[in-house]
Swiss-Prot record:
Annotated Gene Ontology cellular component terms: SCF ubiquitin ligase complex; synapse
UniProt-recorded name of the protein: F-box/SPRY domain-containing protein 1
The organism of origin for this protein: Danio rerio
Domain B30.2/SPRY: from-to ranges: 97-289
Pathway where this protein functions: Protein modification; protein ubiquitination
InterPro entries on file: B30.2/SPRY, B30.2/SPRY_sf, ConA-like_dom_sf, F-box-like_dom_sf, F-box_dom, FBXO45-Fsn/SPSB_families, SPRY_dom, SPRY_FBXO45
Protein family (similarity comment): Belongs to the FBXO45/Fsn family.
GO BP, sorted A to Z: proteasome-mediated ubiquitin-dependent protein catabolic process; protein ubiquitination; synapse assembly involved in innervation
Protein keywords: Ubl conjugation pathway
Source lineage: Eukaryota, Metazoa, Chordata, Craniata, Vertebrata
Amino acid sequence: MSGAVATGGAQSAGLGAAAAGCCSSASGAGSAALLSGGSGIAGRLPSRVLEHIFSYLELMDLLNCSLVCWHWNNCLSDENSEVWRSLCARSLSDEAMRSDILCNLASYKGKLKSFQHALSSHDCSRNVYIKKNGFTLHRNPIAQSTDGARGKIGFSEGRHAWEIWWEGPLGTVAVIGIATKRAPMQCQGYVALLGSDDQSWGWNLVDNNLLHNGEVNGNFPQCNNAPKYQIGERIRVILDMDDKTLAFERGFEFLGVAFRGLPKTCLFPAVSAVYGNTEVTMVYLGRPLDG
């Protein structure tokens, strides 16, 4: 029996590889004609069979599969199906899945997408690292240094939202915002790194100043006696590349638009910190909900 199960698993994995190869070659005229419209063999496979095969594939293969035909797309449309659960289990750490880090993401597909957009371990200061959960930045206790990180993926169009929160002391400067690929992620001293040049835009949570091009662009939010940031409080960042604006929310309160007239270039979620051993978590949420 165990041999039969092993053989069945190997056959399913082989079918998964074949499906992935089929998807990657579907851009060819012959393959496209065979697979499109659900009229070929691909379109006649039962959903439960497709779901089993798809559970062996990686994210990019699944995204390609969703473009093959209506039947395959429909099979992958359930964002909490076994396909997405299986990929979540393989891709995300147990810590991330068990903790409340991803509590505002209802689907397995949403959790996977958030991981794809998390802070980058390859695009950050040498004085920070991304923890095993895949979402939290830890700043090492290095004196006289300001250290930051960018998200893995930047945006040049559309509307996007993500959450950021501190899980340790802020220190004298703690900035959240956006940056181009050219913005530095480390500098000497304790400064507001995001907003220190024309390549980044930031909100310093310590003094509520908006920063860009090395200048203070006023206080935020624009109200009397604005409350100070509390450790653990989730701030939602809303980037609208269609209207070229950056806005923030705290809890269920819209704080307003912080920056307007953003350039038509690729902008990345970013954060900078100065306090030793502090930690910052970022979770990409996708398209913001209006209202």
